Amino acid sequence: DHRDLHSFPTRRSSDLTIGGAPGDSLTPVDIVKFTYAYCEKLRERRPKAEGERYKVVVGKDARISGEMVENIVCGTLVACGIDVVRAGFASTPTTEMAVIFEQADGGIILTASHNPKQWNALKLLNEKGEFLNAEEGAAILECAEKEEFNFADVDTLGSIVEEDFTDRHIDAVLALDAVDAEAVRKAGFKVVLDAVNSVGGIIMPRLLQRMGVECIEVNCNPDGHFAHNPEPLPANLVELSEAVVKNGAHLGISVDPDVDRLALICEDGKPFGEEYTLVSVADYLFSRIYAEAENTGKSLEELSAPYTFTSVSNLSSSRALRDVTEKFGGEYCAAAVGEVNVTTKMKEIGSLIGGEGNGGVIYPALHYGRDAMVGIALFLTNLAYRKCKVSELQKSYPQYFIAKNKIQLSDKALIDKILDSMKEIYASENVNDIDGVKISFEADRKWVHLRRSNTEPIIRIYAEAPTEKAAEELAGEIIGIAEKIINQ
């Protein structure tokens, strides 16, 4: 599920991550096995002539177990004869960028994203600084289970160098054509930042300072003692909302522990809506090209090159992205849930912008990964140009409400029965089954998405409509039908 992708038992492979709570399901021995298996598969994927070295970047968020996990991962890489670039405290997108900067063969990020502080995990990257896919992850798990080790001899051990990539990442964000730090500086914004005492507390204030933004810091000490549940949902952002109002700030900024998700708070203390982070950034990028096309007479395709005038999000994300894309004459495409599925679809159609409705912005002009830094830089540029309040900006977008529910089942076998029945019952509507079953009721601008959990006998149900009542009613209708099927 794109909202709790990382809360898995040990030895589950997703397109991202292998992990658990250290000492419980992610033991030091497991870390050695997984890292060794990663090295084995890396060599298979990128064969080199004898004597040629492999290089892997390792970065971590500020979790309490981070140093322990980092030492074991780096030691194992060295024992496998691989040279390590130790990036230290780094956001997930920074480590992804570091793989590109270093022209490395891969990367390992030590983070459990928005999970509670006792969790940690290894996120595995390829030579492009992008997540391995599910098949590659499964191959690594299979290799790890064999426990057959063949380490380097003493003359071919790897080396470790330390390097901080924070400023290079910020430089790359500020160098983007669509980012206008000067306009942001002139706007004189004051923001409150909540970085949940992780690595966002290092990179975000530095980026904001370079854009001339006054930044009031809340929970910005990267000690891994998360001040609240680290998932950037409204219930966890009460302290931030209060600080925005109390300080008379223009905006509240919340990031998760590894800084790939961005949630915003309006100047009145109300949530901007994490679904709307991506919507707002896309609206800015499309409107910018559209205005240039109007002024120059050039085509949208010409002006968005080398990308296409398209957007992508996953099936559980708000329809608002499709609406703003189509408003400017662009085309929207949906992908299965999971960052690697979104980026695969984006590459396939050459999207200008994409991401996930959980505050994950993917801007390929920088790199193919969710990145809160590029998200906030684009958002603030737009806010400076629009010269309006954040709450007014939010109201300018199509308004939708998402109801989130789940059905607990006694038997996993019922999942397919329910999903298949839904496809039959709603066959006259627009049905997408690339990832569970999504039924779109076009005339009413509403949809419902049923997805199986990877780890337990649960069906998650997301329903979206233009009003909260309509979303809840749609979810209720689907749950009612599911219960009848269960009781047959």
Predicted feature residues:
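N-terminal small/polar loop signature for handling phosphorylated ligands or for N-terminal nucleophile
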Residues: 40, 44, 55-119, 206-265
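An N-terminal, well-structured beta->alpha segment
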Residues: 7, 14-75, 79-80, 159-191, ...
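Gly/Ser/Thr-enriched, mixed-charge loops and adjacent short helices
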Residues: 120-247, 297
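Gly/Ser/Thr-rich active-site loops/lids in small-molecule metabolic enzymes
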Residues: 133, 217-219, 270-289, 339, ...
